[in-house]
């Protein structure tokens, strides 16, 4: 019985470390400028551009859709384009959620870049300053 318990404990411990992701140290990030905010009925379209470490010049378009009448949370759907420093263009769909607290909005989403990389991404968006502070955590590296 003791051996069975120790085996089970070891399996749980090992499995936890095998499949967990480290969200304490971002792989990279940067600051993007808000270029446009276009309000709609229950949604807003937003575009951003700027520099992200590891990716170079980044261009992003989001549609933020509200899920409640107070318009303080919802879903986001978008596209990203990046021109790497070597001139290669990479693309990604963006899917996630957002939460607004006054003039500050938090974005949480994943990307699936066409080079095989997968990232979990967090943005701190300041609507008044028209800036977004970006952090990304690599879940899987590129295929190359």
Where are these regions (language model features)?
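Short amphipathic alpha-helical "recognition" segments used for binding
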Residues: 6-7, 139
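Bacterial N-terminal signal peptides
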Residues: 7-16
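Positively charged n-region of N-terminal signal peptides that target proteins for export
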Residues: 1-4
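Beta-strand-enriched cores of mature, soluble protein domains
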Residues: 19-144
């Amino acid at each position: 019985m003791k051996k069975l318990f120790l085996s089970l404990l070891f399996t749980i411990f090992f499995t936890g470390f095998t499949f967990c992701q480290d969200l304490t140290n971002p792989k990279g990030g940067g600051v993007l400028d808000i270029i446009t905010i276009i309000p709609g009925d229950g949604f807003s379209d937003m575009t951003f551009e700027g520099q992200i470490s590891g990716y170079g010049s980044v261009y992003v378009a989001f549609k933020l859709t509200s899920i409640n009448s107070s318009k303080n949370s919802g879903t986001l759907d978008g596209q990203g384009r990046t021109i790497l420093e070597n001139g290669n263009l990479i693309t990604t769909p963006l899917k996630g959620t957002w939460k607004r607290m006054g003039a500050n909005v938090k974005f949480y989403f994943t990307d699936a870049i066409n080079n095989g990389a997968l990232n979990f991404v967090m943005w701190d968006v300041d609507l008044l300053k028209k800036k977004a502070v970006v952090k990304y955590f690599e879940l899987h590296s590129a295929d190359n």
